C-alpha cells in the first residue's frame, strides 16, 4: 500500500493537554512537509463501543494509520498501533507518563520517537521517516507482551469469546 500524507491523532477528551496553538503549529509543520494532513482521535462520541462494532473500529484505525507517511500523536494506543503497523510516529508527552513509559519500551524502533519539547518535532520527523527498518520484530513482541497476550486469551476463553 502506498502511504500518503500525515496524520495527527490527538486527545480531544477531558484528558487533553495539547493547547490549540501547539496543535496548529504541529499542523503547519506537517503541512509543509507532507501537504495532505488528516486529523483524527480514537474517541468517537460518548458511551462505550458496542461489541459488534469493535473489530470494525479497530480495522478502520489500523487502515488509517497504515495509509499515512507519518503520525504525530499524544495517544498511547496510537503510538502502539504505529509500532505494529510500521508507521513512522512522533509521540508527544501528555502529562500522564503512559506515552513516555511505553516510548521507552519502543525506543529501539527507529521509526517511533517520543519527544517532550515541540522544538524537537522537525528533527524527530526527519529521524522516524528516514528509518529504513519499519517493523516490530515478532520475537521481541512475544517476549515483552507474551504474558499479557496469554492472560487476555485466558480471559476470553473463560468468558466464552472466540479468538479475535
Predicted stretch roles:
Residues 1-164:
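Active-site anion-handling motifs in enzyme catalytic cores
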Amino acid at each position: 500500500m502506498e502511504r500518503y500524507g500525515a496524520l495527527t491523532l490527538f486527545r480531544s477528551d477531558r484528558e487533553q493537554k495539547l493547547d490549540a496553538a501547539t496543535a496548529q503549529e504541529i499542523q503547519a509543520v506537517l503541512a509543509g512537509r507532507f501537504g495532505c494532513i488528516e486529523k483524527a482521535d480514537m474517541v468517537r462520541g460518548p458511551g462505550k463501543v458496542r461489541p459488534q462494532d469493535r473489530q470494525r473500529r479497530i480495522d478502520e484505525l489500523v487502515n488509517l494509520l497504515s495509509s499515512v507517511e507519518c503520525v504525530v500523536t499524544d495517544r498511547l494506543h496510537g503510538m502502539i498501533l504505529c509500532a505494529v503497523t510500521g508507521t513512522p510516529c512522533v509521540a508527544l508527552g501528555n502529562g500522564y507518563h503512559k506515552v513516555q513509559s511505553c516510548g521507552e519500551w519502543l525506543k529501539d524502533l527507529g521509526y517511533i520517537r517520543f519527544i517532550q519539547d515541540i522544538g524537537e518535532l522537525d528533527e524527530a520527523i526527519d529521524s522516524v521517516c528516514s528509518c529504513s527498518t519499519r517493523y516490530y520484530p515478532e520475537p521481541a513482541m512475544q517476549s515483552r507482551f507474551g504474558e499479557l497476550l496469554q492472560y487476555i486469551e485466558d480471559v476470553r476463553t473463560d468468558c466464552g469469546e472466540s479468538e479475535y
